Every structure is written in structure tokens, then in C-alpha cells.
Curated annotation (Swiss-Prot):
This is 4-hydroxy-3-methylbut-2-en-1-yl diphosphate synthase (flavodoxin). GO terms for molecular function: 4 iron, 4 sulfur cluster binding; 4-hydroxy-3-methylbut-2-en-1-yl diphosphate synthase activity (ferredoxin); 4-hydroxy-3-methylbut-2-enyl-diphosphate synthase activity (flavodoxin); iron ion binding. It comes from Kocuria rhizophila (strain ATCC 9341 / DSM 348 / NBRC 103217 / DC2201). It is an enzyme of class 1 (oxidoreductase). Binds 1 [4Fe-4S] cluster. Its EC number is 1.17.7.3. Its cofactor is [4Fe-4S] cluster. [4Fe-4S] cluster binds at C281, C284, C316, E323. The gene is ispG. It comes from the Bacteria. Pathway: Isoprenoid biosynthesis; isopentenyl diphosphate biosynthesis via DXP pathway; isopentenyl diphosphate from 1-deoxy-D-xylulose 5-phosphate: step 5/6.
Length: 388
């Protein structure tokens, strides 16, 4: 008989690698890189010339947890709208510039916190870097070198045949070296591709070449589901390796959805304070309640909460009681009723038609009792719930 020595389990290794050490830059009031929290960005979809609509969308993004917002600037009329938008926006504004270098200077003069430049399509960009560096330095404006697979320099496409990770990295490193030749260092870099595998490798190569802060993004990621999967896959790999200082989830969906997904990715990796989390079973033939409807009603009813609260909505007696006990608050449903758990203890059993009402009331009561620190986490010693 072969003996098996079970012994003591090995000490668990950290899931995430230490954060990559980079220089720090500022995008207005938001630090990017070094020890700054990883920020979430989005981009408005309104015409920038429609100042009121753009500011309204920025306000919605801010409320959803967006840290930095980007606005398009394809024309002089858009450039003329930037001063008001930059002044009235509650979060730092970055102007997105393509083709015309004059709009880089217009954005700097308008008071934007940052400018994104695309070296692949701005006319004679390399010749413009000295002037851009001086103007940005004088105004305290940071730059993003935004390399994109869809607009890569033709010389690199000829060299590599297509937008490979090496081509994206080489473009970024070249442009970074030109800015640094003019003693400008207040920039971050992105190397975006619509294929997450190519994008991941490009960022890994770039991270090996310098200490620049990196803006993560999968370009043209697609509709909500597809884009979420692509971004979560790519960001999860890179962030777990300590690579990435600010993120933008690109979706063919309202920009607020980009922010929600971005925040969820960071929270799932423990890189942003946990907030409301709904745990619900996928449902199966054992379910004795409409779990989909129940979970959606609870999620909608608690969407206003910003405290770290885990709520479990379970549809049967197999995993239901265990999951509900592990959550801060939960329900295990069956036989036309639901057992309500708080901190692992059953506090009451209610009829099925009262489950949602009871969970919402209990969750709000628990949220009100929480005392949170400046990072949105429970204060030690305060009357709080314990996360499962």
C-alpha cells in the first residue's frame, strides 16, 4: 500500500504580483502610477459641441465612479467648447486628439487636465513633440501616448507585417524617447489592440522597457457582453502581474456601463474597495423560486448603496443556506418561503412575496449602521457587518 503524507498545506502564495513601480504623473487632481490607486476612465459619447449634454453625461459618469473622462475634439467647434467643459467638469477632462496637432495646443490652452495624442495619425507628429512638450510642461498638462493597432505607423506595419505586440511596443517606446529627449516626462502610455492576447503581450513587453505609467484598454472591444469578457480577461491577466495604472473598458454601450464594469474588475481583484455585491445562484431544476427575478429586484432595490455589503440570493436548500450564511445578508428560498440570514444567523422566515421587501429593509438598516473610513471601508471597532 502506498502511503500518502498529507502533512501541512503549503502557505498560500499571493494571487496578485506586487504593483509595478512606475513614475507618477497627475491628470488634474488624480494621480496615475506609483502608489496612486488604479483609476477608472471613460469617454463621452455626446458631441463635444453640445456642452450641456456633455456635462450631463460627465456628471452621470462621476456618479457611477468614473475618475477621469475623455472627450473627443475633432474640430475647431469642439475645441471651442473645451474651456467650459474643463472648467465645469467635476472630474479631470482629457481631450482626445487625432490628425490635427493644432487641437493639442487648443486643449492645453483650454485648461484640460490631459491630452491623448495618437502618434499614428497626427500629421508629422514626431516634428511636433518639442512644441507639445513645452506647452504641456508650462501648463502642467499630462499627455497620453495612445498607440492603437488601427492607426499604427506604416513603417512599422511594413516591418512586422501587421500590428504585432512588438510593433505596438516599438511605436510606444520610440515616441516616449522623443518626449524624454525634450525633458518631458509627465506622460502615460497605452498600446491598444482589439485582440486581448495581442494586447496583453504588448503591455508585458512595454512594462519591461521603462517605468512609464500604463493606461490599459482593449480597443473596439465590442458589444456589452463581448467587450466585458475581453476587457476582464486582459485586465485580469495584466493587473494580476502588477501591470496597469489606469483602465478604460471600451464597450458599444452607454459609457456608464464602462465605468461599472471597470470598477467591478478592480473590486473583484481586491484593487478597489469592495462595495455592494449580489451573490445569486445560476438556478437549476432544484430552484423553488424565480431566482432571476428575485436577484434582479434585490439588485435594483440596493443599487444606491455604496457600502461593502454582500447579499446572497439563493433558490434552494442545497447551497442556499451555506451561501446565505457566508454573506453579510442572505436568503435561502424554498417551499414558498425564505429564511433570512444576517451574519450567518437566521433572523426570520418570511413568505415568498415578502422576501424582497425584507431584504431591502434589512440591507438599508445594516448600511446605515456602518461607519466607513475615507476609503469606503468599515472602521475598526465600529458596528459593522463582517464580509463572508
Amino acid at each position: 500500500m502506498t502511503s500518502v503524507n498529507l502533512g501541512m498545506p503549503a502557505a498560500p502564495q499571493p494571487v496578485l504580483s506586487p504593483r509595478r513601480k512606475t513614475r507618477q504623473i497627475r491628470v488634474g487632481s488624480v494621480g496615475v502610477g506609483s502608489d496612486s490607486p488604479i483609476s477608472v476612465q471613460s469617454m463621452t459619447t455626446t458631441p463635444t459641441t453640445n456642452i450641456n449634454a456633455t456635462l450631463q453625461q460627465i456628471a452621470e459618469l462621476n456618479a457611477a465612479g468614473c475618475d477621469i473622462v475623455r472627450v473627443a475634439c475633432p474640430s475647431q467647434d469642439d475645441a471651442d467648447a473645451l474651456p467650459i467643459i474643463a472648467k465645469k467638469s467635476p472630474i479631470p477632462v482629457i481631450a482626445d486628439i487625432h490628425f490635427q496637432p493644432k487641437y493639442v495646443y487648443a486643449a492645453i490652452d483650454a485648461g484640460c487636465a490631459g491630452v491623448r495624442v495618437n502618434p499614428g495619425n497626427i500629421r508629422k507628429f514626431d516634428d511636433q513633440i518639442e512644441g507639445i512638450s513645452r506647452a504641456a510642461e508650462a501648463a502642467g498638462v499630462s499627455i497620453r501616448i495612445g498607440v492603437n493597432a488601427g492607426s499604427l505607423d506604416k513603417r512599422l506595419l511594413e516591418k512586422y507585417g501587421k500590428a504585432t505586440p512588438e510593433a505596438l511596443m516599438e511605436s510606444a517606446v520610440w515616441e516616449a524617447s522623443l518626449f524624454e529627449q525634450h525633458d518631458f516626462h509627465d506622460f502615460k502610455i497605452s498600446v491598444k489592440h482589439n485582440d486581448p492576447v495581442t494586447m496583453v503581450r504588448a503591455y508585458q513587453l512595454l512594462a519591461e522597457r521603462g517605468d512609464w505609467p500604463l493606461h490599459l484598454g482593449v480597443t473596439e472591444a465590442g458589444p456589452a457582453l463581448q467587450g466585458t469578457v475581453k476587457s476582464a480577461t486582459a485586465f485580469g491577466i495584466l493587473l494580476s502581474q502588477g501591470i496597469g495604472d489606469t483602465i478604460r473598458v471600451s464597450l458599444s454601450a452607454p459609457p456608464v456601463e464602462e465605468v461599472k464594469v471597470g470598477n467591478q474588475i478592480l473590486q473583484s481583484l481586491g484593487l478597489r474597495p469592495r462595495k455592494l455585491e449580489i451573490v445569486s445562484c445560476p438556478s437549476c431544476g432544484r430552484a423553488q423560486v424565480d431566482v432571476y427575478k428575485l436577484a434582479e429586484e434585490v439588485n435594483e432595490g440596493l443599487a444606491h448603496l455604496t457600502v461593502p455589503l454582500r447579499v446572497a440570493v439563493m433558490g434552494c436548500v442545497v447551497n442556499g443556506p451555506g451561501e446565505a450564511r457566508e454573506a453579510d445578508l442572505g436568503v435561502a428560498s424554498g417551499n414558498g418561503k425564505g429564511q433570512i440570514f444576517v451574519r450567518g444567523e437566521v433572523i426570520k422566515t418570511v413568505p415568498e412575496d415578502q422576501i424582497v421587501e425584507t431584504l431591502l429593509a434589512q440591507a438599508n438598516e445594516m448600511a446605515e449602521s456602518m461607519e466607513l473610513d475615507e476609503n469606503g471601508q468599515p472602521v475598526e471597532g465600529a458596528p459593522v457587518v463582517t464580509a463572508g
